[in-house]
Regions:
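Conserved core of the PLP fold type I
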Residues: 4, 9-155, 166-187
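Conserved core segment of the aminotransferase class I/II
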Residues: 42, 182-249
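N-terminal basic, amphipathic alpha-helical segments
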Residues: 1-3, 227
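Walker B catalytic acidic pair
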Residues: 162-163
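Hydrophobic "anchor" residues on beta-strands that sit immediately upstream
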Residues: 124, 158-159, 194
Length: 249
């Protein structure tokens, strides 16, 4: 039935709807605790969206960059460790000096982070806030608050917030997780964070749906860059996931 291929007024068999289907954006907004207009729904891999975000910062700069990162004399990146090797490989491939941040039972050593971000060459930090690889550490609320209220010297400092396990709870009842976007906005850092998630740990690894969430100002900026790269992602897969998952529950 052709009607099964329509989401609102969008025909999923056609081009268009760069930032994703309205229903898919609403689903991820519910999952992440943010607003649908802050969500960009892409293809099957959140890692690809992460790579693309760093790549665009490198070639074009971010919203508040004074120049593209490729024109900076030296760039550094904070890497809570032990952590996810594929994260580190992304920033390493762009020539960043990787700085190890020791992990504690409550997340990265924030005393060290707060000192290091005073260096304008430090452009960002990787984060897996829940069940961080490989130790399964969950960031405490205090750690997340301290991250959200950071005052980096670099105007384009970027939190890469990989919320891969955002709806998982391995022990006990589900505990709502702090929304990093609203926390950053609360502390005057609305444009400092890009949050990533996918259904890879929910439906099918390699055949799910991925997204990023960011401020509306960042979204407007990024859409202009992404529009050069792709007309639209796989909306049929997006709709398939919405119809099967239905909601966060």
């Amino acid at each position: 039935d052709p009607a099964d291929c329509v989401d609102g007024d969008v025909n999923v068999r056609n081009y268009g709807q760069l930032s994703g289907l309205p229903s898919a954006k609403a689903l991820f907004a519910e999952i992440l605790g943010c607003k649908p207009e802050q969500v960009f729904v892409g293809g099957n891999a959140s890692l690809q969206l992460m790579y693309d975000t760093i790549a665009k910062a490198y070639t074009n700069g971010l919203l508040h960059s004074e120049k593209p990162w490729c024109r900076e004399e030296h760039i550094k990146w904070l890497c809570p460790a032990p952590g996810y090797d594929r994260h580190f490989k992304v920033t390493e491939s762009f020539g960043f000096e990787l700085i190890t941040i020791p992990m504690t039972e409550t997340g990265p050593n924030m005393d060290l982070v707060e000192q290091l971000v005073k260096d304008p060459a430090v452009k960002g930090m990787w984060n897996v806030p829940k069940y961080s690889n490989p130790d399964g550490i969950i960031y405490s609320d205090e750690t997340i608050e301290r991250i959200a209220r950071l005052k980096p010297a670099a105007p384009d400092f970027l939190l890469m917030w990989d919320n891969a396990y955002c709806i998982h709870e391995f022990e006990g009842e589900f505990v709502p997780f702090p929304d990093i976007l609203s926390l950053c906005e609360k502390y005057g850092n609305a444009d400092m964070v890009f949050e990533f998630a996918s259904t890879s740990k929910i439906t099918l690894p390699g055949a799910g749906v991925a997204c990023f969430a960011c401020s509306e100002a960042n979204m407007e900026y990024m859409e202009k860059l992404i529009n050069v790269q792709i007309i639209s992602y796989d909306k049929i897969n997006q709709l398939d996931h919405v119809k099967n998952l239905k909601d966060k529950a």
